[in-house]
Amino acid sequence: MLTIENVNQFYGQSHILWDLSLEVREGTCGCLLGRNGVGKTTLLKCITGMLPIKEGQIKLNGRDISKISTEARARAGIGYVPQGREIFPQLTVEENLKISLGARDDKITRVPDHIYELFPVLLDMRHRRGGDLSGGQQQQLAIGRALVLDPKVLLLDEPTEGIQPNIVRDIGNVIRKLNKELGLTVLLVEQKLPFARKVADDFFIMEKGHTQASGAIAELSDDLVQKYLSV
């Protein structure tokens, strides 16, 4: 379970997150929704430790992780796929995946088989350079690299952005499998409502750095969409 309690965060003098609280239930997918600039990516970076919080707590299965380092949070079970994927273009697919092995406590030296089972294209292309992959394949690589950590919580920042429809479908299927079969908790930022409705169990709508509405994804009404998400 991932719990955010009364988190405040600033960029200089700008107050970005205001007493923000939410809870992602264990083994479910929660979706952060909101217009651009409301603090969704900032929240994910706060959870990873890339950005410090001024006040509040971030808890993983009841443990406060808000004061430990980014590396320690990764070891504790926080996996993260940022916008832009940030793979290493000169490294092979397999080398990109192996980068995450160093953060595992069991010190294994090979990519776990289930990563290739989730993303068969990565097995077929494991000796190709990351920069030679399509955008969709790079997104699969980025998710696979995060999963090599064997995380308890996976954070995804707009995983469908700029991705071809068939791979969007595959990514959605993987998220549901991670939830339902492997019990992984997922928190994703998403702009595409059809995708959010397909993969998410719960939603959290953000506006001005605060959670304005939340609930089961089936409760995401047209009125809420019009009020908080329409451009």
Q: What are the residue ranges of the model-derived segments?
A:
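Helix-to-loop junction immediately C-terminal to a conserved catalytic motif
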Residues: 48
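Helical segment within the ABC ATPase nucleotide-binding domain
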Residues: 169-183
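Catalytic Walker B motif of ABC-type/P-loop ATPase nucleotide-binding domains
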Residues: 154-158
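ABC ATPase NBD coupling module
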Residues: 52, 64-85, 108, 112, ...
